[in-house]
Regions:
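Negatively charged, low-complexity tracts enriched in Asp/Glu with abundant Ser/Thr
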Residues: 1-20
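Short, Lys/Arg-enriched charge-dense amphipathic segments
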Residues: 3, 35, 42-43, 76-78
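Residues in flexible loops and secondary-structure boundaries
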Residues: 12-14, 31, 49, 67
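A short, structured beta-strand/loop element
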Residues: 20-56
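Mixed-charge, Lys/Arg-enriched low-complexity segments
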Residues: 45-78
Length: 78
């Protein structure tokens, strides 16, 4: 198991009352005390909570993927 500390995140979903896909960069903190920086995609429920899905997040389209990567690149962290 690992906990994820979010350092940066972007979404291209503007409706706050709908599910939103996020691209995040942060640090994975493992139970044994090790840490690693990395990227992940994750969904948020309409109420804002993260959906933990055993390491998998469905990316609906290539357009979503490219938009999220472009947004993160524009912010300078990808």
């Amino acid at each position: 198991m690992a906990n994820f500390e979010i350092k940066h995140e972007v979404t291209n979903y503007e409706d706050p009352n709908d599910w939103r896909l996020y691209f995040q960069w942060g640090t994975y903190h493992y139970e044994n005390g090790d840490s690693e920086d990395g990227f992940r995609f994750i969904w948020r429920y309409p109420e804002g909570n993260l959906q933990a899905a055993r390491g998998q997040a469905r990316i609906p389209s290539k357009q979503d993927l490219f938009e999220l990567l472009a947004l993160a690149s524009k912010e300078g962290w990808f």
